[in-house]
Structure formats: C-alpha cells, structure tokens
C-alpha cells in the first residue's frame, strides 16, 4: 500500500501544486473581487454535481458490486455491467448538464441570494459555459474508479494536472479576449481533457466497448438502491460549500474568493493524502470485507490512519501557526492586496483546525462502503450539515468569514467521530490504543518542529526548518521499521 500510495501522492502533489498556481494566477489577474466571487460561485455549483458522480458516490458503490458480480457470474458479464453503468452515467450527466444551462439563472438566484442583480447575471453566464464540465468529469471519474480497481492509480490521479493546465492557459492567454469568462472556458476544456486522459487507457484495458444497457441486470437495480443513501451522504458533505457560499454572499466583496482560496490550500493535504490513500486502500479493504477478514481490515485501516496522521498533523500545524505566511507566499501578487491576504489567512486558520477530520472522513467512509453500508455515512453527513448550517447562522454575525470556516471544521469533527466509533462498535474492533499512541507521538514531533521554526522570518526557510526538524525525529524509526512504523503488533 505504501509504495502505491507514494507514487500516486507524487502525481497528486504535482496536480495540487498546479492548482495552487492556478489560484495564484487568478488572484494576480483578478484579485479578490465581485468578478471572482461570481466565478467561484458558478464553479462551486458545477463542481458540486461533479463531486456527486465524478469522484464519489457512483464509483464507491460500483466497485464492491463489481467484485461480487465477477465472483458470481464471471469476467464477461462483469464487463457488460461496466458498460451498462457507464452508459447510464452518460445519459444522466448529459441531462443534468442541459438542465443546468436552462435553469442557470434560477440556480444562481437560489444559491447566492446576497449578490446584486448584475453579478447574478455574470454568475449565470459563467455557469452556462461550465455546465457540460459535469458530463465529462462524471465519465472521467467513473472510468478512473474502474482503472483504480484494476491497480492503475497513476493515470486517474494525473487527470487533474490537465484540468489545472487548462485553467492556467485560459487565465494567461484567453483572459485577454474573454475577461472572467476565460476561466469558465478553461473549466470546460479541462473537463474534456480529463475525460480523454482516462478514456484511452480504459479502452486499452477492456479492449472493447458496448453501448448496450442491460436494464434487466439485477446488479443495475442494486446499484440504484445502494446509490441513493450514498448520494445523500455525498450531497450532505458537498452542500457545506454551497451553504458557506449562501452565507458569504451577504458579507463584504471578496469573502467568497477568500473562502475559496483558503479551502484550496487546506484541501492540498486532503487531496494529496486523504483521497490518495483512501483510493489505494479501498480495493484491498473491499476484498478483505468480502472474505470476512477482520484482522486484515483492522491492520489496513489502522496503519492507513496512522500514515495519514503522520502526513496530516504537521500540515495542520503549518497551516494553523503559519497561515498568513503561507497565503502571502502563494497569493500575494498583482491585484491580491494586503486586506485580501488578511481575510484569506483568517479563513485558512479556522479551516485548518478541522484538517485531521476532513482527511479521516475520506478514509473511514471508504471502510463503510467496503462493508456495503452506505446508509450510516449518509446519516452522519446529514447530521454534520445540519450542525454546519446552525453554526454558520450563530457565528456569522460576530466572526464573519472566520465563523463560516470554523463551523465547517467543527461539523467535520462531529462527522469523523461518529463514523469512527460506530464503525468500531458495529464492524471491526480497531486497535484504537495504537492509533491514539501514534497520534500523540506525531503531535509532539509537530510541536517541536513548530517551536524550532516559529521565530524565523523568511517563510521558505521557516517551512524548510519545520520539515527538517520533524523528519529528523522520525528518520530512524522509519529506517528501522519501514511500513511497520505505522502499525506494530
């Protein structure tokens, strides 16, 4: 797991760094303005639908059913199942994309109530341009899940590189001709590129394709039944961002942009560590669950959580204690002024408090899906979203943008602990003692590294000192025990 995770993390890291550079360019050319608020609002809506199918519910529901069908009915029938699901995905995504174009103005009116009428028109136009991004990214995400299942992790992980390059190109060159619309065209082109990157390896893997949909297949019906609670869960998690936008639309201009830029920074470790390790681990947990191998599931999950903590806890300390330094380093160029730095750094600090929880939810949710339990993650996500809405309402008056970020962190923490403890109670008795002890050791190492770097003024040197001091404390244990440093029996 560790070797595959590291290879995929390197690719994902490249993609996420390009994503930060993309954000830097948008900040440089457009600053934190009403136009960027309109762009990020429209993008969040199209991206929200992408999260439902593109990299979430559908793939996680499909993979366990695919393994079961292959075991019961053989290779050929399982291939036909893949084609049926992909064809249904195409039809559904196409319909949703068309509906987004038709009803774009109504969607914008509903989501960002606080925008002026002129700004709503801009956001509606941008959403129309980006609508078909959902079609391409849904197909890309589904094909990527299938490639992951066959052990091809690098290709799906690389798709976001092309997406980021598309928006970078659009910001640098198309901006001259289309202004803020250039970013929307970049999103659409990026979606097409992501689809093409996985489409050809997918065809090479399966060697054929069929446009047939077998609606009589009991596994198609079973997929629909299991998908509903999964969709509710993913919907609830993603609605957090939409809820934040709704409240932020009533704040000063640039607040939505600040939340978006801050979330992109804290989502760097979530994407690089949480999503990567979860995707690599999911097929093996699914197989262990199918064989009722509880010890194997315990070992895989605890070692993965420890490995995630090793990567995430130091990231949490950096983003919390050095938030302003990090934002200055990434965004403080061109039209991105000192006030924009200040509010973005404040958002980052409060988002980062929940970093461990965001990452943990990614992994533990996969453990539920491997067990065929799609309902509990959905219920816990709904609980978290209700808490997030209530906390947003309570915090926004006194804490403005900071309150929105803090509410997201708290609700994510509730979601994570519900997932973890109910999983331990109902499925596998995880070695929580090992997990807690390792977490304490990593936290102590992070405190020492923070103390060593805190008073250094140069931000790059500060981050280097932090990294060196932290890694030196773990160099010998990792050298001696290798993977076993994260789970020793």
Regions found by a protein language model. Name each.
Residues 1-489:
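Membrane-embedded alpha-helical bundles of multi-pass transporters/translocases
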